[in-house]
């Protein structure tokens, strides 16, 4: 009887520990998603700040008679990894470029991204995924004033049933502005 009671008690404790582990995994996945949302927001704000900073520098140059030079913005690498059983990772970003001035204007931009995830599990389980996207935008204006803007977005997602997964996101966006005197 003692052995049966000890066995029953051990099974009960094991079930409690498994429940706690499952809850911890869910909490970790939720926290990872929230963290990634915050990082995506921060990344978008950083790109926007850099864009406006470059635009202001170009306006200062134009007002002082130096003309507007090329504007190159944001090469961003964002890697997120998680290392628990049934792990998942998520990566995304936004890149944008903006250029403007007086006179004829020519502008174009390219944004692209590639995400891939790789995770290894137990004795013979293995999981791999990759995803990529590319966005292209450009504008041309000639006349009294010129303005061009471009942005690219890409999103990669991977998850693995093994012990870890990772997503790496790379976004490159550039925009240029050239003035022509008539």
From Swiss-Prot:
The record marks 1 as: Stutter. Residues 63-182 are annotated as: Tail. PROSITE patterns: IF_ROD_1, IF_ROD_2. InterPro entries: IF_conserved, IF_rod_dom. Residues 1-63 form the IF rod domain. The keyword Mitochondrion does not apply. Residues 1-63 are annotated as: Coil 2. One of its GO terms (cellular component) is intermediate filament. Keywords: Coiled coil, Intermediate filament, Keratin. Pfam families: Filament (PF00038). It comes from the Eukaryota. SUPFAM superfamilies: Intermediate filament protein, coiled coil region (SSF64593). Residues 157-182 are annotated as: Disordered. The keyword Coiled coil applies. Residues 164-182 have a biased composition (Low complexity). There are two types of cytoskeletal and microfibrillar keratin: I (acidic; 40-55 kDa) and II (neutral to basic; 56-70 kDa). Belongs to the intermediate filament family. PANTHER family: GATA-TYPE DOMAIN-CONTAINING PROTEIN, KERATIN, TYPE II CYTOSKELETAL 5. Heterotetramer of two type I and two type II keratins. This is Keratin, type II cytoskeletal 60 kDa, component III. It comes from Bos taurus.
